[in-house]
């Protein structure tokens, strides 16, 4: 099954997440199909905290991809 989930990056105590479309059987930071956005929970000032490619997310959900709980919350908050 294909899932859209977060892959952690960044430094110690300074997380940065990429929203990845990947096969559920692959590791979280392993092989992926496509990157559809990013989430920076520690964004300050002019930094962009969240960017989502909603067209690609809708495409993958239409193809049967599942959203992880955290990604579903981010998508819901971004679409307000």
Curated annotation (Swiss-Prot):
Keywords tagged on the record: Ribonucleoprotein, Ribosomal protein
Organism: Hydrogenovibrio crunogenus (strain DSM 25203 / XCL-2)
GO biological process, one term: translation
Protein name: Small ribosomal subunit protein bS16
Molecular function per GO: structural constituent of ribosome
GO cellular component: a single term: cytoplasm
Similarity remark: Belongs to the bacterial ribosomal protein bS16 family.
InterPro entries: Ribosomal_bS16 (IPR000307), Ribosomal_bS16_CS (IPR020592), Ribosomal_bS16_dom_sf (IPR023803)
HAMAP family to which the protein is assigned, alphabetical: Ribosomal_bS16 (MF_00385)
NCBIfam families in UniProt: S16 (TIGR00002)
């Amino acid at each position: 099954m294909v899932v859209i989930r977060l892959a952690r990056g960044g430094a110690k105590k300074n997380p940065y997440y990429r929203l990845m479309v990947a096969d559920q059987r692959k590791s979280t930071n392993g092989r992926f199909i496509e990157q559809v956005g990013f989430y920076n929970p520690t964004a300050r000032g002019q930094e962009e905290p969240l960017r989502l490619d909603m067209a690609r997310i809708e495409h993958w959900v239409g193809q049967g991809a599942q959203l992880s709980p955290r990604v579903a919350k981010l998508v819901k908050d971004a679409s307000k």
